[in-house]
């Protein structure tokens, strides 16, 4: 029995970046031997076992054969006779097909180290096209490794385009699409996930609402980049710099979906996009099964971002109404998340990345002033029933007015 560290752990170790998960492949063993050694089986379709102490995954070396459509249409063959090279051959990218033994000796039959050096994401074999999920995985690796200068090999991009053309992406479940998208939101460059999917044609299939933004013009006065799709990528980039929260990053990526359905006769103006976008966000989140926490923030940002951009023009009464609608009295962190998205939107414009965003400070000032109004003092002043809320509203508005006058 031979045990090797494989996949992402070896790749990240060689790149000098933190290793979080370790996966192992076992050559020359049977399932019975693994059970006898105290390992617990976890794989229903594949021979995967958990180590009795570390709980890390150990998989028997295997080969795969395409038998049907989609990422599940595979027949798995495993036996003690399957060689390490055969197991590595079925993997997606050369940089993920390097193994390391207990002495630190590397086994790299497909040139993964060379591609790591050259910063290339390249498929291991032509069997790459058999699994449509790999299109999304490569896009995610492009996002994860973008700061190190990685790019997708031309020939791999061609294979990704052929997978899209084959219609195989339709076999991906909503859960798988969301899983990869969510993982991409946690990478250093989430915009690259969208950009690579756009490049190979997959964005139109898995996230058509975002794809529809490309080629849609905006007023050059406010958006030097003009194209709404390019703006979305820039906003995604800025959101990742401003916040590590996947929820904030998601909301930033989808806040402008309404611009994709503006009638061309109205271009480059998008007066209704804050409202038309709400339906599209709901539709996308339902289809891809996006968690409610992500959907809810995205809807709020979509509806309010134009108002927040105009913070200097908003009346105190309007500000309090916005705070009520967002329910920030009970969820203070929500306002901060929304302001981060708006700041990313503001900075996500060509040449304006470092432009100040005083609107956030003004909104926060107004919020803190409104927050200082205590309901207890209103009750002590003799107000009862519905009159308490009316008086609270009035005092909050006055507090905001005074704070902004003194700003």
Swiss-Prot record:
InterPro entries: CCA_bact, HD/PDEase_dom, HD_domain, NT_sf, PolA_pol_head_dom, PolyA_RNA-bd, tRNA_CCA-adding_enzyme
Entry cofactors: Mg(2+); Ni(2+)
Comment field (misc): A single active site specifically recognizes both ATP and CTP and is responsible for their addition.
Reactions mediated catalytically: a tRNA precursor + 2 CTP + ATP = a tRNA with a 3' CCA end + 3 diphosphate; a tRNA with a 3' CCA end + 2 CTP + ATP = a tRNA with a 3' CCACCA end + 3 diphosphate
Residues where Mg(2+) binds: 21, 23
Classification via Gene3D superfamilies: Beta Polymerase, domain 2 (3.30.460.10), cca-adding enzyme, domain 2 (1.10.3090.10)
Name of the featured protein: Multifunctional CCA protein
Species this protein is from: Vibrio vulnificus (strain CMCP6)
UniProt domain HD: residue ranges: 228-329
Summary of subunit composition and partner proteins: Monomer. Can also form homodimers and oligomers.
Family of the protein in this entry: Belongs to the tRNA nucleotidyltransferase/poly(A) polymerase family. Bacterial CCA-adding enzyme type 1 subfamily.
Binding residue positions for CTP: 8, 11, 91, 137, 140
GO molecular function: ATP binding; CCA tRNA nucleotidyltransferase activity; cyclic-nucleotide phosphodiesterase activity; magnesium ion binding; phosphatase activity; tRNA binding
Note on how the cofactor is bound: Magnesium is required for nucleotidyltransferase activity. Nickel for phosphatase activity.
Keyword annotations: ATP-binding, Hydrolase, Magnesium, Metal-binding, Multifunctional enzyme, Nickel, Nucleotide-binding, Nucleotidyltransferase, RNA repair, RNA-binding, Transferase, tRNA processing
Binding site for ATP: 8, 11, 91, 137, 140
SUPFAM superfamilies: Nucleotidyltransferase, Poly A polymerase C-terminal region-like
Free-text comment about domains: Comprises two domains: an N-terminal domain containing the nucleotidyltransferase activity and a C-terminal HD domain associated with both phosphodiesterase and phosphatase activities.
Cysteines paired by S-S bonds: none
Family matches, as PANTHER family: MULTIFUNCTIONAL CCA PROTEIN (PTHR47545:SF1)
HAMAP family: CCA_bact_type1 (MF_01261), CCA_bact_type2 (MF_01262)
Pfam families: HD, PolyA_pol, PolyA_pol_RNAbd
Function in brief: Catalyzes the addition and repair of the essential 3'-terminal CCA sequence in tRNAs without using a nucleic acid template. Adds these three nucleotides in the order of C, C, and A to the tRNA nucleotide-73, using CTP and ATP as substrates and producing inorganic pyrophosphate. tRNA 3'-terminal CCA addition is required both for tRNA processing and repair. Also involved in tRNA surveillance by mediating tandem CCA addition to generate a CCACCA at the 3' terminus of unstable tRNAs. While stable tRNAs receive only 3'-terminal CCA, unstable tRNAs are marked with CCACCA and rapidly degraded.
Enzyme Commission number, as recorded: 2.7.7.72, 3.1.3.-, 3.1.4.-
């Amino acid at each position: 029995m031979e045990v090797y560290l494989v996949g992402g752990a070896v790749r990240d170790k060689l790149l000098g970046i933190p290793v979080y998960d370790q996966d192992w492949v076992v050559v020359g063993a049977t399932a019975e031997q693994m059970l006898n050694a105290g390992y617990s089986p976890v794989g229903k379709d594949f021979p995967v076992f958990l180590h009795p102490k570390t709980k890390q995954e150990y998989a028997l070396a295997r080969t795969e054969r395409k038998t049907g459509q989609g990422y599940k249409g595979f027949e798995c063959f495993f036996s003690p006779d399957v060689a390490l090279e055969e197991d590595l051959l079925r993997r997606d990218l050369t940089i993920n097909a390097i193994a390391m033994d207990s002495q630190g000796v590397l086994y790299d039959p497909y040139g993964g180290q060379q591609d790591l050096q050259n910063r290339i994401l390249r498929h291991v074999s032509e069997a790459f096209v058999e699994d449509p999920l790999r299109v999304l995985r490569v896009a995610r690796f492009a996002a994860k490794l973008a700061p190190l200068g990685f790019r997708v090999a031309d020939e791999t991009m061609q294979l990704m385009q052929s997978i899209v053309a084959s219609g195989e992406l339709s076999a991906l479940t909503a859960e798988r699409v969301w899983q990869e998208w969510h993982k991409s939101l946690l990478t250093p460059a989430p915009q690259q996930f969208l950009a690579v999917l756009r490049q190979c044609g997959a964005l139109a299939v898995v996230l058509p609402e975002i794809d529809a933004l490309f080629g849609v013009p905006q007023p050059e006065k406010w958006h030097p980049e003009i194209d709404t799709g390019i703006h979305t990528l820039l906003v995604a980039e800025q959101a990742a710099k401003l916040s590590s929260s996947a929820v904030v990053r998601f909301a930033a990526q989808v806040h402008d979906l309404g611009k994709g359905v503006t009638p061309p006769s109205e271009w480059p103006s998008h007066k209704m996009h804050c409202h038309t976008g709400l339906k599209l966000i709901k539709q996308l989140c339902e289809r891809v099964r996006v968690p409610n926490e992500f959907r809810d923030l995205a809807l709020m940002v979509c509806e309010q971002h134009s108002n927040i951009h105009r913070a200097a023009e908003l009346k105190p009464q309007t500000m309090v109404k916005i705070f009520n609608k967002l329910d920030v009295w009970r969820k203070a962190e929500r306002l901060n998340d929304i302001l981060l998205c708006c700041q990313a939107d503001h900075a996500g414009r060509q040449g304006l990345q470092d432009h100040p965003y005083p609107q956030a400070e003004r909104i926060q000032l107004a919020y803190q002033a409104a927050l200082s109004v205590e309901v207890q003092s209103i009750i002590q002043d003799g107000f009862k029933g519905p009159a308490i809320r009316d008086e609270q509203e009035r005092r909050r508005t006055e507090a905001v007015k005074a704070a902004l006058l003194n700003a």
